[in-house]
């Protein structure tokens, strides 16, 4: 690292050697020699290119609709390459929709052939440049002194780039070109780790993150379109294909922008024509989702550009298609999408540039710079640079001095500090097959041509990204490797190592930064210890070594904690997890000498100290008052922060909040002329929750109380309401002030409390702080309300008592008569004796009760460390219980069918019973259990026995699969759910997905204000859930409910073990003799043995790890759900 810094310092003070003379051969041999191309290729041909639905570089952008679906007889890439080299007077064009490849020329096609190293010509693209994506920026906006020897561009200073007069005077004979800069272009041999895993792409979109380079879609060498999603990891120098959820459809010539750690894909061309849909990929949740937008959306288009500025995606130009006349039009319009509100709008600006496509647009400090492109007649536009200013909504043309870049299209542009680098592309005037690079210095308004002693082949419709002090080029040619450009020597390998080390350090928690530094650099620790007398700081080594309350000889060591964990796992027979812990930690599990559990021993030790304490109290102090907090802990952990509350505003009294202004509230007027709150501070929301005015919005009250847990806690809300009730005194007219301010505000506060206790009781009767909340409410009722003689005291106390009783909503009519078997009271009652409808009813009662017990706060996604969205048992216990039952039902179905008597006929009967049960579940609108049973019926262990399924069975399963199909965002399921009666059990996966989409696409805060629009969207889902939680009018049959109430918990390992045992019985010499099942039950498994799961656990289990999440290492199925559900 030190050598690297020394080199970069010397680079600015040394003059590089003169470049080789023009008659000398190039020293670079890394790139293959370009084939000789007949000079006739430079003359345009009049043959129209009518076979390609997407024009190749230089071809007309107009499409021929009748050829869009020609998808046969695609020649192999090798044959195209050979054909292109052997027939040098013509060029082979690929039909991008998959059609035939023929040798025809278009007006600009023949000059384009000079750019390729043989092989197929790539179609053009429009590459969106990303502003703010880890690109360096300078704060100093003042232009530098005008001098040919001083440059404020992204490259190093002119002394290290240009040949100065001093070098000439010292004997140099080189003629200085002030419009040329010298750099180095390298062929990325060191970056080809697994380049064979990815085909060359063009017309794709890309973005750069801290850890890698991401690309999506584009055109493949055979001319077909793709929706591949790849990442190139800088640290390991390897390509990886990403397959997350429902990716956008295949497309090319689309655009992509990076915003809020998400990649937005817009438009493009697909086999069905141009598109104007928009998808987003969240790098936090690693999922795709389609973005639903409002407003004036751009027409379907491709070949456009998109950039981001001030939270808006700005779309310019491109080719659109009239859906009626199929007429193709090149545009110069501008559309803006607010990425926070998802609102489209057309921007009407003055003096826009001529219509164009295949151009580039780059954003720099509020200005969008547009370079090159093609017009309606496929002619490359002038080389004038157009600049659009977002703040003033105006266009202007900029003339750059210095070198002149030839008009071109299908090039790439990238921002590097304060310069834009243009590379490659198709140009009429270009006769070389080498990659050309131009630098546009935005401060000096000067264009420099980049000269290099090494050459690489030209690229068209490629990517160019900044990494460190280099610019990487990928795609747009027959090779799938990287080339990269740098003003210094080839230090790319070292840069990657530094980046990897930087990312590793950034992943260390802040509280461990100091300890990690001391461990990695003992010389710093030694220096710190020697200077303690001067600095006065506490000894770091002493802090970590001296016994104290936090770390002492009696404290629990990590070995002891591991023993505690393994004791728990041993009691639950998780032997495989214990073996993994022992292997990883080197700590062997050993029983205590006394035979008593270590946990029991610990409880005996702490019992005298905790005497009258409840160990489950959330406010239990770790230390007694006389001990206090260990001061040494503060020294070590002074960098620690509680990230869960980093967005909390300062606790200001609600009455000290100022009047409405842009800093504390944002409003919007609705279609019916009503003012709606878009975002506000917490105090300002309390103002509108209990306003002084008589006008009161009941919908605002519902949204606030149902969703308040997403931006505050119930304790803080109650504290703010009490603050609002305590109206400060005023020196104004006392009677008028009391009647117009004091009494209305207090009445509104009491009304809010009544609605909260009555309609949202979950905050008071569930959760770790519910007792504190109830105690605070009691104090308020017995204190302020009683003292003021409020008339609502009685009503509030009645509602508070109601919290202790379950709210039962009876039906006016009796439930339907249950279908009980004749031997209902027989000890030999099995599942085979029970009617399918009654099985479905009892399962529905269980699922409905579990679903009805989920309070709304548990549905809202919780954000834990590193921005990952998760549900877990700590924050959503009822929801997780409901989700985990889906896994239990699916595996119970599989186990019950497999463990049926070895007679194939009985297995088919049991399978038939479950399939008929699915039809009954569908009639009962129990979609959750229906999906769980369907997952069990589609388990690989059952699908491996196709002889058990009849054609009728397959037909019923196919109908259910269609119901849960992802087509049109689960359209069939959503329509079926809308037609359901109030009593239904929805499919929980769709509810979680709807919540997750809102969390991904809508920020929680807007300019330090609570995004209340997001809470309104959350409430729309929560209000529907409330209707679904209506109980069923069904009667419990206890004998039947025994079979489906508490299902045994089987793991994938258990199911595989059962399958293997059954297979071994079939192959054994005693196959004709009845043998008991290895699972612990005998005879038919329809007679459910609820203890069989515990007996089964004597085998090594892999379904749960220490944290309780399912790993299913031995499973080939993807149908299982984890107790921690990642969205």
UniProtKB/Swiss-Prot annotation:
Residue span, LisH domain: 557-589
Biased composition (Polar residues): 122-132
GO biological process, one term: Ras protein signal transduction
InterPro entries according to UniProt: Beta-prop_ATRN-MKLN-like, Kelch-typ_b-propeller, Kelch_1, LisH, Ras-like_Gua-exchang_fac_N, Ras_GEF_dom_sf, RASGEF_cat_dom, RASGEF_cat_dom_sf
Gene3D superfamilies named among the record's database cross-references: Kelch-type beta propeller, Ras guanine-nucleotide exchange factors catalytic domain, Son of sevenless (SoS) protein Chain: S domain 1
Keywords, in A-Z order: Guanine-nucleotide releasing factor, Kelch repeat, Repeat
Residue ranges annotated for the N-terminal Ras-GEF domain, each copy included: 673-804
GO molecular function: guanyl-nucleotide exchange factor activity
Swiss-Prot/TrEMBL Kelch repeat ranges: 212-261, 262-311, 313-366, 367-418, 420-469
Induction description: Down-regulated by Pseudomonas aeruginosa, PAO1 strain and PA14 strain infection and by phagocytic stimuli.
Compositionally biased region (Low complexity): 23-53, 67-82, 133-154, 1103-1127
Residue ranges of the region described as Disordered: 1-82, 96-154, 1090-1127
GO cellular component terms attached to this protein's record: macropinosome; plasma membrane
Name of protein: Ras guanine nucleotide exchange factor F
PROSITE patterns: LISH, RASGEF_CAT, RASGEF_NTER
Annotated organism of origin: Dictyostelium discoideum (Social amoeba)
Residue span, Ras-GEF domain: 835-1062
Function description: Promotes the exchange of Ras-bound GDP by GTP.
Xref: SUPFAM superfamilies: Kelch motif, Ras GEF
